[in-house]
Amino acid sequence: MKTILITGIGGLTPRSIAKIIKEKHPDYKLIGCDVDKKAMGFFMKTKDGRQLIDEYFIAPRCDRPEYFPWLERLVTEKKVDYSFVEPESEIVEWGRYYEVNRKYPCPTFMGCRLLSESLRDKAIMAELLEGTEFIPKTIKVTQKNPRFEDVEKKIEFPCWIRATEGTGGL
């Protein structure tokens, strides 16, 4: 039996990863962690009603100094074989950890740190994808400069306003 850690388990991608692993390898032990104590509340059952995650831990924020010591203890205590790292903010920090330590806390599956740097800020991502078919018309607004006239003329109402980072940026 393998033990797999999935970070950011409250997010859609980590839950999807967990569902596939549970479906293909029901004997694997899945450990989830997230900074949000409510992350385990939604969509955490398999199709046949089993728990998606075997153990759940509330993690320190990945940009805090206590994150990696906490994570290293978890990997050791739970005998984690592999980790799947999400979301982009954690990928960036794990990438930095690797640059300093020349290793990850355990064998790891994750995206590219440099790409994740741009993808975690939805405004930067919109700038990179501007003019392609991969993103709808986009205008950067702020609370200080809401640009209502530009939104009305260029995008039109109704429209969707998103946060550039975090769960509001999903």
Language-model segments: which ranges?
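ATP-binding N-terminal substructure of ATP-dependent carboxylate-amine bond-forming enzymes
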Residues: M1-F109
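Short histidine/acidic/glycine/proline-rich micro-motifs that form metal-
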Residues: C62, E88-S89, R113-E117, T142
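Residue-level detector of family-conserved "landmark" positions at structurally sensitive sites
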Residues: V85, G111, K137-I139
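Short alpha-helical interface patches
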Residues: V100-K103, R113-R120
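Active-site nucleotide/adenylate-binding loops and adjacent lid/helix of ATP-dependent enzymes
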Residues: S116-L170
